[in-house]
Amino acid sequence: MSRIGKQPIAIPAGVEVKLEGNLLKFKKGNLAKELDTKANVNVEIKDNNILFSPKGEDRQSRAYWGTYRALAYNIVVGLTQGFSKTLEINGVGYKAALKGKVLELSLGFSHPINYDIPEGIEIVVDKNTIAVKGSDKQVVGQVAAQIREFRPPEPYKGKGVKYSDERIIRKAGKTSKK
């Protein structure tokens, strides 16, 4: 029995949810998202709640049950509150600047790195902090991971791009022989 799958999702005010076959359509204002559920998961909209249940008792149906409930919940939260990830840049001369729909990063390379911001993502740069915001949890995490990947934090001095809540395990440097 899926503990996540059996919990109903309350539909907040202002969010429209329609079920067309296996396709769940979410809409709030001008934001619209779709979730294509597999044929082995039942979806019902009852009493302003979205209910999920497995069609069969096979392993795959039970696995998809909790997965699709979590995906639908993330869409509802994304439409109402949004998601954000915060990155910090540490290092001498390391900086970030926003130029239109391009994030320009100076991370100690011989050239600046230009990162094209995907559609539906908002990036706010404040000194050495980059905030990635959007309504799709997967895309926000992916963009933050791609920015971090340009210069991951190194364990000796901690220079690089890291998540704000990430803890870097530091290493001791070399000791001289006597």
Curated annotation (Swiss-Prot):
Keyword rRNA-binding tagged: yes
Example of a GO biological process term: cytoplasmic translation
GO molecular function: rRNA binding; structural constituent of ribosome
Keyword annotations of the record: Ribonucleoprotein, Ribosomal protein, RNA-binding, rRNA-binding
One GO CC annotation: cytosolic large ribosomal subunit
Highest taxon of source: Bacteria
Family statement drawn from the similarity comment of this UniProt entry: Belongs to the universal ribosomal protein uL6 family.
Name of this protein: Large ribosomal subunit protein uL6
